[in-house]
């Protein structure tokens, strides 16, 4: 694949995902959120009782679809393999910092772009911070910083997260064990089927 074809496919993926996000917002997702990885993980964590903020508790099918979409397409294209990174504690801490930073600015980079397209000035402030963060990371890499190489692990390991999200989907649709907000952003959501399909599309393109 040459660079031109790659850019065209990325542009097509961006257009499709943008349309999916707009459709999810029109079908009930928060208008200034549509599809946000950080926010949806927060909502799903709340649904499982991992935090007590009652306005952001809902098992988001988009997150489930995202994981399953990537998993299914990787198997279909024979690209599936399970890898594990080195320096797990550092990776964990960096992940926590990224999530806190995303939620402070009310969303992940995906939602940031969606909000920028709607003219939200706060998103533009976040964009400046995002650029500075990327520049800092590039500088660190050029200075030799590395977390070490990822290594291939047993394929069963890669199926653990898809199995977990399937279990969450079953609990969300077949039981009342998970929490669901009655007000606030957590109460605003598209129909489950539409959300799940949207997540599958995002996951497939991400893979």
Give the predicted meaning of each segment.
Residues 1-207:
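Membrane-interfacial helix-loop segments of redox and metal-homeostasis proteins
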